Curated annotation (Swiss-Prot):
Belongs to the universal ribosomal protein uS2 family. Pfam families: Ribosomal_S2 (PF00318). The gene is rps2. GO terms for cellular component: small ribosomal subunit. It comes from the Archaea. GO terms for molecular function: structural constituent of ribosome. It comes from Pyrococcus horikoshii (strain ATCC 700860 / DSM 12428 / JCM 9974 / NBRC 100139 / OT-3). CDD domains: RPS2 (cd01425). Keywords: Ribonucleoprotein, Ribosomal protein. GO terms for biological process: translation. InterPro entries: Ribosomal_uS2, Ribosomal_uS2_arc, Ribosomal_uS2_CS, Ribosomal_uS2_euk/arc, Ribosomal_uS2_flav_dom_sf. This is Small ribosomal subunit protein uS2.
């Protein structure tokens, strides 16, 4: 059964991909596996895995440089940056400057053909501009997110350090695999730790 998953189920669980929040939206109901006694909603990892397979095939159809990945969230910044390095996609870790996709006068103006949003709520500016220019939106969504304007939702813990690293690592591997740049998933030798934001303890 483990073979059905892109990574062993234990790896998803160890990274906390399934850990949601204590809030849920009607939109996300279909992705929720159960609610714990403490009120925390748990995501269905099988659905996460299925959506990652679909997203990998979908994103592989685009020219690498026409894909944009964004994350305002701190723990998503290293995964997004590494994802860009590995796949050739454009990455904007940190603050998303208003007008980046809509105003040619902005310094780093860029018109992507598809965008990957780490959190629709935190990345609201990028989301707004993607809607404005009418490009497909692939979004990592947690139990409290809305799916309005999201074309392809990947249900996951979109706040956790290890969860975000694993999701972007799998997505990068799937894109390379579906592009034919690697002939098997085992050929992808970059460790998931390279996608992980490091905690600096003072």
């Amino acid at each position: 059964m483990a073979d059905e998953y892109l990574v062993p189920l234990d790896q998803y669980l160890a990274a906390g991909v399934h850990i949601g929040t204590q809030q849920k939206t009607k939109d996300m109901k279909k992705f929720i596996y159960r609610v714990r006694q403490d009120g925390l909603y748990v995501l269905d990892v099988r659905k996460t895995d299925e959506r990652l397979k679909v997203a990998g095939k979908f994103l592989a159809r685009f020219e690498p440089q026409s894909i944009l990945a964004v994350s305002v969230r701190l723990y998503g910044q290293k995964p997004v940056k590494k994802f860009g390095e590995v796949t050739g996609a454009r990455a904007i870790p940190g603050r998303f400057l208003p007008g980046t996709m809509t105003n040619p006068a902005v310094k780093n103006f860029f018109e992507p053909e598809v965008i990957i949003i780490t959190d629709p709520r935190a990345d609201h500016q990028a989301m707004k501009e993607a809607i404005e220019i009418g490009i497909p939106i692939v979004a990592l969504v947690d139990t409290e997110n809305l799916l309005s304007y999201v074309d392809l939702a990947i249900p996951t813990n979109n706040k956790g350090r290890k969860a975000l690293a694993l999701i972007y690592w799998i997505l990068a591997r799937e894109i390379l695999y579906n592009r034919g740049e690697i002939s098997s998933r085992e050929e992808f030798k970059i460790p998931v730790e390279e996608f992980e934001m490091k905690i600096v303890r003072r």
